[in-house]
Amino acid sequence: MKRKLVYVCLLAMVAGGMMSFSYDIPEKQETGGREDRVISFPGAEGHGRYTTGGRGGKVYHVTSLEDDGSQGTLRWALKQNGPKTIVFDVAGTIHLKSELRTGKDHLTIAGQTSPGGICLADYGFSINSNNVIIRFLRFRPGEASGKEPDGLGGCDKKDIMVDHCSVSWSVDECLSVYGMENSTVQWCIGSEALRKATHVKGAHGYGGNWGGHKASYHHNLIAHCESRVPRLGPRPSTLALGECVDIRNNVFYNWAGNGCYGGEDQHVNIVNNYYKPGPATKQASKQVQYRIAKV
C-alpha cells in the first residue's frame, strides 16, 4: 500500500511539474512578425499567404460582360485608384479586346462572387502590380487575337496569391507566374495549351514558367501540355534576392516533350508531387516518360 502511495505521489509530482512547466512558458513578446499577421483567406498557404490584396479598400461591382472600359466592366474596375476588391454581379464570358492587366497595387479579384463564374477569353491576363489576390477565374485566351498570349502570366512583382483558377488554351504558356517575391499559386489548373496555333515558332503549347524568391506552387494540376511542365525559370530580379521555390502536392499529367526542367541558380523543393504519363507522353523517349525533373 505504501509503495502504491509513493507511485501516486511521484505521478502527481511529475504531472504537477509538467503542468507548471507548460504554464511557465512565456508568451511571445514579438508583434508585427509574420506569425501575427492575418492570412489572405481561410485556406491560403505558402509564401504568398499573407497577401492582403484590396483588404480595407473600396468594393467595385462588375455589372457588364462588355470590354469597352465603360463603368461596370472589369477593365473599368481595374483602372480605379486605391486598394480595391472587385466582385461580380454577372456571370459568363468576357471577350477581351486586348490584353488585360491588373494595373494597380492592392487588388483582390473575387471571382467566387459571380453567380455562375467568369471566363476571360480571346486575350491573356497579366499580373503587373504588387499585392494582388486573384481567385476563382477561368482564362481561355485561344488564338483569336493572332498573337502569342499566356493564359495567366506575370513576373517581377511581390505579394501575389492565385487561388482556384483554371487556365487553358494558351498559345505560349498556360500558367507563368514567376519571378515574384512572396507568391503562391494554389489549387489551379493549367491545361490544354494549344500546340499548333499562332506562335511564331510553330508547335508550342507549354505549361508554364515557375520560380521566384519565396515562391510556392501547391495542389495544382498541369496537364496536356507539350513541355515546361513546369520550366523552372529564374528572373534577374529574384536571382539577386535568391531564388527559393517550393513545389509540392501537384499533379503533372500527359506531358508530350520535356516535363519539368531548368532550375539554373535556384533552390527548389520538389516534394510529394504525382507524375502520370499519358497518351502524348508515350510518344516521347523512355527517359522523358519517367523523368521527374531535368535540372
Regions found by a protein language model. Give the residues of each.
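Acidic glycine-/aspartate-rich tracts in secreted/extracellular proteins
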Residues: E66-D67, A91-T93, S114-P115, G278-T281
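Charged/polar low-complexity intrinsically disordered regions
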Residues: G257-C260, Q266-V271, P277-V295
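Bacterial Sec-dependent signal peptides at the C-terminal "C-region" and cleavage site
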Residues: A15-G32
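Positively charged n-region of N-terminal signal peptides that target proteins for export
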Residues: M1-K4
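Extracellular beta-strand/beta-solenoid scaffold signature
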Residues: A121-F125, S145-G154, W169-V177, T198-G212, ...
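Acidic Gly/Asp/Thr-rich repetitive segments characteristic of extracellular carbohydrate-active
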Residues: I39-I86
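Extracellular beta-strand-rich solenoid/capping regions of secreted or surface-exposed proteins
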Residues: L74-G82, I94-T108, I118-R135, P141-K158, ...
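Right-handed parallel beta-helix
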Residues: H106, G111-Q112, N130-P141, K158-W169, ...
